A protein has these predicted regions:
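Bacterial N-terminal signal peptides that target proteins for export
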Residues: 1-8
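C-terminal motif of bacterial Sec signal peptides marking the signal peptidase cleavage site
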Residues: 16-19
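Acidic/polar, low-complexity intrinsically disordered N-terminal segments immediately downstream
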Residues: 22-111, 118, 270-311
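Intrinsic-disorder/low-complexity, polar/charged segments enriched in Ser/Thr/Lys/Arg/Asp/Glu/Gln
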Residues: 32-36, 83-87, 166-168, 179, ...
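Tryptophan-paired
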Residues: 58-114, 191-272, 311
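Short, low-hydrophobicity acidic/polar segments
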Residues: 71-174
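C2-type phospholipid-binding modules
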Residues: 129-135, 257-286
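A sequence/structural signal for flexible, mid-protein segments enriched
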Residues: 130-228
Length: 311
């Protein structure tokens, strides 16, 4: 009898531990709800899912349908593939719907959550965006490529694994970054210049829409001097939101004089045949200056603008 009195509690303890994947919850808490995800990218122009490389880091933030924070988890050394599964364990397992938000590529040196995720009061007050310097520029010119996604996971779609409720889903990620490779020819090699893209898209709500109030940003890069062909690269965040107002500007560093100033979407990108901002994220911009003080602007090989200029 004494042997049974000793062994039965041990057996019960082992049962509890294994039923919750080795986790023991205090005060009679339920075993966790396990949210499992396999994120992927697929634009309307892609025939099959893709799994971008170099994501490195991803944060998943989970709210209930009323906007209360239920939990979050940051994954490091992230590798996306069709076999990748990322798991978030929640002690609350009685929600009908879990609202899940994803920021992939959210490198700490480039981006920030305001307020900090652990201090989020509600979904409506959560924002995410670039770290900006005092002059409104990203702290890192070529910040990490960014992806966003969201999905509502319903408890009705769950299954039981051990004593835990498991919900599996495949969230779609949308790329939020754009690269502009600017190549300049025909300009005096010694003239110090820089390119800027000015916009209002430095910060987002957790659902991926522009934050309110909007936060202005200047994406800037100096154009190296001393060669007949000069090249630089700018990276921006998402441009296809209808409320973004990107302006492409070329300036002289020494005088501040503007050499070029365009509405990037209306005057330039909008003139590209078949332009689809949800699909296109790399743009090669050629600025060809001529001795007659004219400039021709091409994007991805298409001439989108030409006119006379004085400087």
């Amino acid at each position: 009898m004494k042997f049974l009195q000793r062994i039965i509690p041990l057996l019960l303890l082992a049962l509890v531990a294994t039923s919750c994947n080795g986790l023991i919850y205090e005060q009679g808490d339920d075993c966790p709800t396990l949210l499992r995800f396999t994120p992927y990218v697929q634009t309307p122009c892609m025939e099959a899912p893709a799994y971008p490389q170099g994501v490195d880091r991803m944060t998943v933030v989970v709210f209930n349908k009323e906007g209360k924070l239920l939990g979050y988890k940051t994954f490091k050394d992230v590798v996306l593939s069709e076999k990748s599964v990322f798991e978030v364990a929640l002690s609350e397992n009685k929600e009908a719907v879990y609202r899940c938000f994803f920021w992939a590529g959210d490198a700490e040196e480039d981006y920030t959550y305001i307020p900090e995720i652990s201090k989020l009061p509600t979904l409506a007050e959560a924002t995410f965006g670039l770290k900006l310097s005092a002059n409104g520029r990203p702290e890192n010119k070529l910040f990490h490529t960014l992806y966003h996604g969201n999905i509502d996971v319903r408890n009705a779609d769950s299954h039981i694994e051990g004593a835990s409720t498991v919900l599996y889903s495949k969230p779609l990620l949308t790329e939020y970054s754009n690269d502009f490779v600017v190549r300049v020819t025909g300009l005096r090699e010694s003239m110090p210049c820089r390119m800027e893209i000015r916009d209002n898209n430095a910060r987002y709500s957790m659902n991926g829409a522009l934050a309110s109030p909007q936060v202005n940003v200047i994406y800037a890069a100096d154009i190296p001097s001393g060669a007949p062909r000069r090249e630089t690269t700018l990276r921006t965040l998402r441009l296809d939101d209808a409320t973004t107002q990107p302006e492409l500007v070329m300036l002289r560093n020494d005088t501040g004089e503007e050499l070029l100033h365009f509405d990037l979407k209306k005057d330039l990108l909008g003139k590209l045949p078949g332009y689809r901002p949800e699909c296109d994220h790399l743009f090669v911009v050629d600025l060809k200056f001529s001795p007659s003080m004219a400039v021709e602007i091409s994007i991805n090989g298409w001439v989108v603008h030409s006119y006379d200029i004085e400087f």
